[in-house]
C-alpha cells in the first residue's frame, strides 16, 4: 500500500476561542505552506515513522500510546478495525512552521 496526502496550513481570522462555546469562527487555508504524509510498504517488520522536522525517527511500538503521532495512527487502526498491522514506512514533512499558529499539527493529522 503506497499513499500520499497533503494538507494546507490555516489561519483563523476570528472566533478562535468562540468555537469552545459552540459559536462560529472564520478560518481560511494558507496554501503557501503544507504538511505531506507518505505511507509506503516497508521491507522491515513494523511501522516506522520518519518526521525530520520534529526530529522523530521511531518505530510505532517504541512510542507511548499517547504520543501525538502514535495516537493518530493507533486510532486509525481502531476506527477501521485493522487488527493485523501492516509493515509500513510513514514519512512526514511540513513547510508549516511549528508553533506558528498556522495549524501544523492539524495539517499533519488531516494528511
Question: What are the residue ranges of the model-derived segments?
Answer:
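ATP-binding N-lobe of GHMP and related small-molecule kinases
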Residues: 1-102
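DPxDG-like acidic metal-binding loop motif
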Residues: 102-111
Amino acid at each position: 500500500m503506497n499513499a500520499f496526502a497533503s494538507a494546507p496550513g490555516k489561519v483563523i481570522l476570528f472566533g478562535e476561542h468562540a468555537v469552545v462555546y459552540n459559536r462560529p469562527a472564520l478560518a481560511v487555508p494558507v496554501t503557501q505552506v503544507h504538511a505531506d504524509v507518505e505511507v509506503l510498504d516497508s521491507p522491515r517488520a513494523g511501522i516506522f515513522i520518519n518526521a525530520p522536522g520534529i526530529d522523530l525517527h521511531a518505530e510505532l511500538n517504541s512510542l507511548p500510546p499517547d504520543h501525538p503521532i502514535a495516537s493518530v495512527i493507533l486510532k486509525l487502526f481502531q476506527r477501521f478495525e485493522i487488527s493485523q498491522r501492516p509493515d509500513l514506512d510513514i514519512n512526514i514533512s511540513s513547510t508549516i512552521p511549528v508553533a506558528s499558529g498556522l495549524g501544523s499539527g492539524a495539517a499533519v493529522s488531516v494528511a
